[in-house]
Amino acid sequence: MFDSPKVNDGFGLMFAAGYLKTMTDAYKLKPGEASAFIVFRHFATPLGLSDDIWKKYKLGKMLDIMDPATKKPSERNFVWKPNAGDMMNTDASADKMVAMPGVVIGVCHYAVTVLSGMAAKGAGVTPEVALKEWEAGVIPGAMLVPSGVLAVGRAQEHGCTYCFAG
């Protein structure tokens, strides 16, 4: 269980990818025999949202997240289908990770609610409209969890080990 409360250049994904690679290399496990639950919560929540949401709601500006290519506030999710140089390890991108057997990406609904409400006025919509758009804008294959903290706790209750990845 990889707890990602900060963007941290996408290292939450890279920690999970490193763990899975180590499990297959060191223990000769096959893909899917080890699992990783990555939780994007708090200010890392936008890593679980589409480029359209990033652009419309100016998430880079709102949360001081710089685009690795332009060095300006990001208007895109640089861990989803990244360009060369966007991440230290583009093999650990969210689109590749969520497609791997045994990998689940959870996106904190509590943070989605709070952050969408904060961003609504700047996008010219009501908080209710923003929330619906953000809920619909979760990256394909990821899932909304009631809250990131709840997901972290419940995962541990069910035997997952904890890794701070933010």
Report each predicted region and the residues it spans:
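Secreted/extracellular ectodomain signature
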Residues: 1-166
